[in-house]
Design a protein with these regions (language model features):
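Generic N-terminal initiation segments characterized by hydrophobic and/or small/turn-forming residues
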Residues: 1-4, 203
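Short, Lys/Arg-enriched N-terminal segments with co-localized hydrophobic residues
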Residues: 3-14
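Non-catalytic nucleic-acid-binding/docking modules located in mid-to-C-terminal regions
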Residues: 16, 55, 59-69, 84-92, ...
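Noncatalytic, basic helical substrate-engagement surface that gates or grips nucleic-acid strands
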Residues: 16-150, 156-181, 189, 281, ...
Length: 343
């Protein structure tokens, strides 16, 4: 019997279905799911990452898995404050927290080496790219296929489409162009409105993000304090967005506004918005970065891996990290890991 999620994709069974893993996001977010010692947290991170892949593979009839990894990011050169807050947070870690973080990165490298060397999954990384760039690039390079993005990152909302879904194994939440669904396939209820959470509007969500900035990535707002819905005397995001294509009064009224920051520097909204588009829009990277994205994907897929006995290799990996629950169902976990990329 087909699952709920397979019904979402009715009529497009001839397409390939790629499971695209935001690897570091999934692995490191999983550490916060359980309390306990470092071994417990590492075990949970491994389990949730592999289980997310297995579940997405089964629910969406996957055909190939792609693990996307982080580089330093070109955005730090384009915009100096980008993710500077992450380093500030690391500098504030206690000795115990710092040691735990180091161990997690070491284990993550072990996991990365396993999927790179012992499975047929495509694994992509470039020193200048973030996983977001590679995931978006893969979707854009395979427009006639289906894609399931495994991540908790809200940045992927802009990619949601009839052929692109996002799944969080940590929250057991699925986001499609039709709405937000829990693990049973039921629509998610918005905690504020007490009503069904409306389906995402990718284009407006991206516009709002470029206007408001992103505190988690230290991307500053283009227009601090801007309202979503305007008032009688002031244009809001909704009105400006509706006027985006025609570039009429409401658009210009907002974009030509000026404001002064805490250091006395004057900003024009349009200038900061344009900067944020380059930082946030996963179709708007600079031309040289777009070339790197394309080249990285082509290099990763030119010679698809042909690794044999992936199931046995998984069993050895499970034994090394004491993952008995996964070892007991190794055939189900191995299936997505042994599927080759077909050109």
């Amino acid at each position: 019997m087909a699952t709920f999620y397979q019904f979402v994709y009715r009529g497009v069974h001839n397409m390939a279905t790629y499971i695209l893993v935001d690897t570091a996001n999934t692995f490191f977010r999983a550490r916060h799911v359980v309390r306990g010692d470092i071994d417990t947290k590492v075990g949970m991170a491994m389990h949730i990452t592999l289980n997310s892949v297995k579940k997405a593979w089964q629910d969406f009839s996957g055909t190939h898995v792609v693990f996307c990894l982080e580089g330093r990011s070109w955005r730090k050169d384009f915009y100096e404050p980008y993710k500077r807050n992450r380093q500030v947070a690391r500098d504030k870690m206690t000795v115990t927290e710092s040691e735990e973080d180091t161990v997690f990165w070491e284990i993550f490298d072990e996991f990365k080496n396993f999927v790179s060397d012992k499975t047929n999954c495509t694994v992509m990384r470039h020193k200048q790219l973030e996983a977001d760039d590679l995931i978006a690039g893969w979707v854009q390079a395979h427009p006639n296929d289906k894609h399931v993005i495994i991540s908790t990152d809200g940045d992927f909302a802009q990619l949601i489409a009839p052929n692109v879904t996002q799944y969080s194994g940590i929250q057991d939440l699925t986001i499609t162009h039709e709405g937000y669904f829990d693990k049973k396939g039921n629509p998610v209820i918005d905690k504020k409105t007490k009503e069904v959470k409306p389906a995402p509007d990718p284009e407006f969500m991206l516009f709002e993000k470029c206007m408001r900035g992103d505190t988690s990535d230290n991307v500053f707002s283009a227009y601090p304090g801007v309202r979503k819905k305007g008032t009688k005397n002031k244009v809001g995001l909704i009105e400006a967005y509706a006027d985006k294509e025609s570039k009429g009064y409401n658009w210009n009224n907002m974009m030509l506004q000026r404001w002064t920051d805490h250091e006395g520097v004057e900003h024009r909204v349009l200038d900061d918005y344009s900067r944020n588009v380059v930082l946030c829009d996963l179709t708007a990277q600079p031309a040289d970065i777009r070339t790197i994205i394309d080249d990285t994907i082509n290099e990763a897929t030119d010679n698809p891996k042909e690794i044999a006995q992936v199931g046995m290799r998984l069993m050895k990996f499970c034994a090394k990290w004491d993952m008995q629950r996964i070892a007991d169902q190794a055939q189900y976990y191995a299936e997505p890991l042994q599927a080759r990329y077909i050109k």
